[in-house]
Design a protein with these regions (language model features):
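C-terminal and late-domain segments of enzyme folds
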Residues: 109, 215, 243-245, 257-269, ...
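Cysteine-nucleophile active-site neighborhood
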Residues: 300-380
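A short helix->loop->beta-strand "cap" motif at the edges of active sites that frequently abuts
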Residues: 114, 172, 322-326
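Residues that mark the start of a beta-strand
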Residues: 5, 33-34, 246-248, 274, ...
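Beta-strand->loop->alpha-helix junctions that form or flank phosphate-binding loops
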Residues: 39-40, 173-182, 274-282
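ATP-dependent carboxylate-amine ligase catalytic core
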Residues: 2-112, 120-147, 156-160
Length: 388
């Protein structure tokens, strides 16, 4: 059965794509649709909210990190059992890593041959919205913009002028609006939305967004604008070794450690490993029969007090590592293996595997893609290999 699919894009970061995406997913789910969510780029946080709203895993589609063949396979293999699919873009529609827009949301929409819903932040503007939408429509004729969602609409008059301006200059329909809200439905932080695992009222926020979409979106027209896509069956996993049938791998997954790609977890399971989810904030100790431990990224700094207070779990972790338990830790997970973390003058003890104290600045220093070439012989990567 074909799955109707669409890309949700914006004119820039902060346009309201995440609000629109979660609102759409939640409303369509309440209406009985099974919707597969996808997030363009390496983002974990938006993907987490989308997964929670849709009630099913959200998969990342990243043109920088993945080949076109991998993107097509990941997308089509994860459509099975769905009625609809929604891909949230990132940044502006044509924004990429260079002046030609390489790896942009537009490129992804072209690759997948999907229409685009354009979310526009209309704060303090009216007719200029039509000029921006018209520019996006004609900038690349391969990009099929199917309609517009107007965000930050202040009054009925504000909405009317923008609708009339769009009708006079384009044939693109307005498929929904998001009124200007007095308070953020999502709690915000330095990288955008706060992870849903850290927000006690996440389900209420999603419920509010579902109500908003039902009141202000033309859900019937949105689903009609989607492009049917035929799912494909994923290939049967080829197990590396019969030994993996007996492997049990612990995964720290809680409010502190949440940054995992579903594909990576599924790859481990596909090789026969059993994954055991562990809450480092509340568990007394690691399970006794683990063969390995995976600690992903996240924000251990926001849970520093809880991590520090869980003395028994930290002692258990150190004991297992001293007894040669293999551990893969990255980003926030690697920080957790340090001696301590310094936050605003207060030092919080961590696992203490490495004699290192981490400190965090108030503002992010930088983030983005990096590319490396392996220059020396080592255990993990072939010399000359390109790493992203």
């Amino acid at each position: 059965t074909e799955v109707a699919s669409v890309v949700l894009a914006g004119l820039s970061g902060g346009a309201g794509k995440s609000v629109a995406a979660v609102a759409l997913l939640a409303a369509l789910r309440q209406d009985g649709y099974a919707v597969s969510p996808f997030k363009k780029g390496p983002d974990y946080i938006d993907a987490g909210w989308m997964a929670r709203a849709a009630g099913r895993p959200c998969y990342n589609l990243d043109p920088f990190l993945m080949s076109p063949q991998q993107i097509l396979a990941t997308f089509r293999e994860h459509l099975a059992g769905s009625d609809l699919a929604l891909i949230e873009g990132n940044r502006g529609l044509y924004d990429g890593v260079n002046a030609t827009g390489s790896y942009s949301t537009a490129e992804l929409a072209i690759l997948l041959n999907l229409p685009v819903l354009l979310v526009v932040n209309c704060a303090k503007t009216t007719r200029t919205v039509a000029a921006l939408v018209l520019g996006c429509r004609h900038f690349d004729p391969r990009v099929r913009i199917a309609g517009v969602i107007l965000n930050q609409i202040a009054t009925p008059r504000h909405e009317r002028i923008i609708r009339e301006s769009l009708a006079q200059t384009t044939d693109l329909p307005v498929l929904g609006i998001i009124p200007r809200l007095k308070t953020d439905i999502f709690p915000m932080r330095h990288l955008g939305v706060t992870p849903h695992q850290e927000y006690a009222d996440a389900d209420q926020a999603i419920e509010r967004l579902a109500t908003l979409a039902k009141e202000h979106f033309d859900l019937k027209a949105i689903t009609a604008a989607m492009q049917p896509v035929l799912p494909v069956e994923p290939p049967a996993p080829s197990k590396i070794s019969s030994v993996t049938d007996r492997l049990k791998i612990g995964v720290l997954r809680d409010a502190a450690f949440q940054f995992y790609y579903e594909e990576n977890l599924e790859a481990l399971q596909g090789q026969g490993a059993e994954l055991v989810m562990i809450d480092a904030l509340h568990a007394d100790k690691l399970p006794d029969d683990l063969h390995g431990l995976y600690i992903g990224g996240g924000f251990p700094e926001t849970s520093a007090q809880e991590l520090a207070n869980n003395h028994s779990f930290r002692r258990s972790l150190i004991r297992y590592i001293e007894n040669d338990l293999p551990v893969y830790a990255e980003c926030g997970g690697l920080i957790y293996l340090g001696r301590s973390i310094l936050l605003e003058g207060t030092e919080y003890p961590l696992a203490g595997v490495f004699p290192v104290t981490f400190s965090l600045d108030r503002k992010p220093q930088a983030h983005g893609y990096s590319q490396f070439t392996v220059e020396g012989v080592n255990t993990f990567y072939a010399k000359g290999l390109q790493l992203k």
